[in-house]
Amino acid sequence: GKSTLLKDLYTSWLKENGVPEDHILFLSLDKDENAECLDPLVLGQRVRSWCRGKDRCYVFLDEIQRVHAIHNPIFHEGKHLLAKPSDEDAITFVSTVLGLSDEKNIDLYLTGSNSKMLSSSIATEFRGKSTNISMGPLSFSEFASYRKEHPFLALQEYLKYGGMPQVVLAGKKKKKTILKSLFDAVYFKD
């Protein structure tokens, strides 16, 4: 889906168009090796440090909604304590993103996949500094043009398995496993 689109397709396009690989940062915030970046202040520091000295850097923050809100450490003896996003002194991923978006050399891309990212207030929070692109499953028309088979057979397949790109590309044996995994991820995590 969106992560693959950004990581594989867009970063490949950037490289093909002359952007050096060391000017592209892709942080998957759902991976354990990036756990420290779930603190919004650490995330901001890491990105700024990585971009320092580069004329232009492309930063992809995948699953940004996983970044925790913290209380401002200035008011808590320097400690980074979890907060609710609504707490008066909370520092959230939105604060970090707004700060990073002010950096002249950073081209910033975010992905998110749950109800926090679907909120109509996100556009308000980003103060007109964002463009929202929603991704959904393939339409039947897209699915049928990809499958290139009799429309009735394509419809049967589409009704049975749907149009999630990962499922469409999988072999018959893997389709159910992928769908169950997607269902569990959405139902239990979101």
Where are the regions that the model predicts?
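Post-Walker A helix-loop "phosphate-sensing" segment adjacent to the P-loop in P-loop NTPases
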Residues: 11-23
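Conserved ATPase-coupling elements of RecA-like P-loop NTPase cores
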Residues: 36-37, 65-96, 120-121
